[in-house]
């Protein structure tokens, strides 16, 4: 694997870490704290 390819793959990994993890945490936080009240 060439260094440029390795850097590209690591940039994808860190991009996912920086974007996906905070988004997931935010969605879980919102879903827990802002539950929709449904009448039965």
Curated annotation (Swiss-Prot):
Subcellular compartments: Cellular thylakoid membrane
Transmembrane segments annotated in the record for this chain: 12-32
Disulphide linkage map: none
Key word Nuclease present: no
InterPro entries referenced in this protein's UniProt entry, alphabetically: PSII_PsbX, PSII_PsbX_type_1_subfam
GO process annotations (BP): photosynthesis
Keywords on record: Membrane, Photosynthesis, Photosystem II, Thylakoid, Transmembrane, Transmembrane helix
Domain of life where this protein originates: Bacteria
Membrane topology reported for the UniProt record: Single-pass membrane protein
Its biological purpose: Involved in the binding and/or turnover of quinones at the Q(B) site of photosystem II (PSII). PSII is a light-driven water plastoquinone oxidoreductase, using light energy to abstract electrons from H(2)O, generating a proton gradient subsequently used for ATP formation.
Subunit structure: PSII is composed of 1 copy each of membrane proteins PsbA, PsbB, PsbC, PsbD, PsbE, PsbF, PsbH, PsbI, PsbJ, PsbK, PsbL, PsbM, PsbT, PsbX, PsbY, PsbZ, Psb30/Ycf12, peripheral proteins PsbO, CyanoQ (PsbQ), PsbU, PsbV and a large number of cofactors. It forms dimeric complexes.
Record HAMAP family: PSII_PsbX_1
Similarity remark: Belongs to the PsbX family. Type 1 subfamily.
Protein name: Photosystem II reaction center protein X
Organism: Gloeothece citriformis (strain PCC 7424)
């Amino acid at each position: 694997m060439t260094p440029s390819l390795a850097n590209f793959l690591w940039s994808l990994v860190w991009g996912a870490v920086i974007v996906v993890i905070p988004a997931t945490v935010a969605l879980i936080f919102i879903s827990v704290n802002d539950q929709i009240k449904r009448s039965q």
